[in-house]
Swiss-Prot record:
Binds 1 Mg(2+) ion per subunit. Can also utilize other divalent metal cations, such as Ca(2+), Mn(2+) and Co(2+). Binds 1 thiamine pyrophosphate per subunit. Substrate binds at residues 37, 258, 318, 345, 416, 424, 474. Mg(2+) binds at residues 155, 185, 187. It catalyses: D-sedoheptulose 7-phosphate + D-glyceraldehyde 3-phosphate = aldehydo-D-ribose 5-phosphate + D-xylulose 5-phosphate. The modification N-acetylmethionine is found at residue 1. Thiamine diphosphate binds at residues 40, 77, 123-125, 156, 185, 244, 258, 392, 428. The gene is Tkt. SMART domains: Transket_pyr. The modification N6-acetyllysine is found at residues 6, 11, 144, 204, 232, 241, 260, 538, 603. There is a cross-link at residue 352 (Glycyl lysine isopeptide (Lys-Gly) (interchain with G-Cter in SUMO2)). The modification Phosphotyrosine is found at residue 275. This is Transketolase. Catalyzes the transfer of a two-carbon ketol group from a ketose donor to an aldose acceptor, via a covalent intermediate with the cofactor thiamine pyrophosphate.
Amino acid sequence: MEGYHKPDQQKLQALKDTANRLRISSIQATTAAGSGHPTSCCSAAEIMAVLFFHTMRYKALDPRNPHNDRFVLSKGHAAPILYAVWAEAGFLPEAELLNLRKISSDLDGHPVPKQAFTDVATGSLGQGLGAACGMAYTGKYFDKASYRVYCMLGDGEVSEGSVWEAMAFAGIYKLDNLVAIFDINRLGQSDPAPLQHQVDVYQKRCEAFGWHAIIVDGHSVEELCKAFGQAKHQPTAIIAKTFKGRGITGIEDKEAWHGKPLPKNMAEQIIQEIYSQVQSKKKILATPPQEDAPSVDIANIRMPTPPNYKVGDKIATRKAYGLALAKLGHASDRIIALDGDTKNSTFSELFKKEHPDRFIECYIAEQNMVSIAVGCATRDRTVPFCSTFAAFFTRAFDQIRMAAISESNINLCGSHCGVSIGEDGPSQMALEDLAMFRSVPMSTVFYPSDGVATEKAVELAANTKGICFIRTSRPENAIIYSNNEDFQVGQAKVVLKSKDDQVTVIGAGVTLHEALAAAEMLKKEKIGVRVLDPFTIKPLDKKLILDCARATKGRILTVEDHYYEGGIGEAVSAVVVGEPGVTVTRLAVSQVPRSGKPAELLKMFGIDKDAIVQAVKGLVTKG
């Protein structure tokens, strides 16, 4: 076989010994913790031994080195064996393994990036392969480097549709630097996996997605060495037939042992049995990588020129997003764009036109698109911007949630928000997205109201840690800011004010423009309103909101193209709660909408200029 050199018997025995030490460590750690998944670890022991101590190239004492091969443990519940590997490699003290799952230890129940050897958090199953695809795409097309990417999946998680989205992606883009290892141990959490040990069916499925699929005995280190040596020329799936709980007498291949540690007495006996098979304590040193990944700096990426808009001209913020992203792409070759086959609606096609080699078409697979972005962003190799209709990000909420747990720096732009998209109807209208993104830990939620603000939001997002969401709209609205207006995260703007203002009206996007129109109407009736643009919904500018409220007799009116739950009104209410004399009145979409013209829908749901006028009058009349 091309490029394959069979290890000698001494090396094969050393790999067997390593696998058994990994088993012992996994059993010891989970028994000490009183929880965990030792049987899921034991099925993967030979796979992990061969991967880390024969196949992969990495610096054991520098796990995040950019030249290293990457590994993603998609079956994150097998974390103890991952920790055991890094102790075997010399990065972790072996005694630390016994602190598994303790609050004082970094060794959580599932992998998290506070561990230097973990790039992405896993444990919500079906997501690791998508992240691995992002890493492999980056390695092949952006870094053009030698490092390879390995991902181990359990057979239970292969029921997840997101796995097959990732399989399709890897096949389409011919990610020949990617290897997925399927640990086919037959048993799921509560029942056998649907295909049990039908490894030929797994092989056909993988081949249908454009993968080279190799069936192996997952407990044969020799077969595994050979299979990894054959992983060339296209994405490769190693379909490893294994047994859950391998090496644990009385438990191997038995149901009802998922997620259960061995009782102490049983563990001691089993450890003695396994240890009796270990012929040498000598450890195998990791093989260092080829150092050919380029140096990358993604800090302080700034627009090459200021915005170029004219006050009063009209542009949709979704188009302004595309223009801004294309411009930012000239500032750094590490700005990349991903889209879910909506690029002619989100206007990310403008980026593709100017930077075709940095645009990733993810097709209609939003869950995988987010995972790809997370993978691309690992080790600070790229700054990804994903775009689709904001409504369609809701199906990727688990991926977004896990991205936050992964401490990932990704930017998501959701277009076509609210009822203002008009005739397409409720399936296309994002009305829950603010609630969703506000709930994500350490997220930043941008809601720009004109082209200038949108361009600034894109630039700020590129330099803001965590999950950034930019909410853009379909209707064209007037430019209201000058090109030199300064924008910052958490800094709102007073767009209109006078000394006699009686109500503070807070709107964003389409509703900010409705508020300005309402202000003109109210002015004719000698009722002054202060109009505030929050710019970021998270974090909100609490100080400015309260200053405006106090200047307008404590009256705040929020108006938003979003459902009441979780939107601007609730966000504003949260920051003013407990403030004496401040009240918040909310206008929002109250029920599932329908098709219609944008103006008709804004009126129907009481968030247009007329509704604002009536609400302001009601507040003023109340006194």
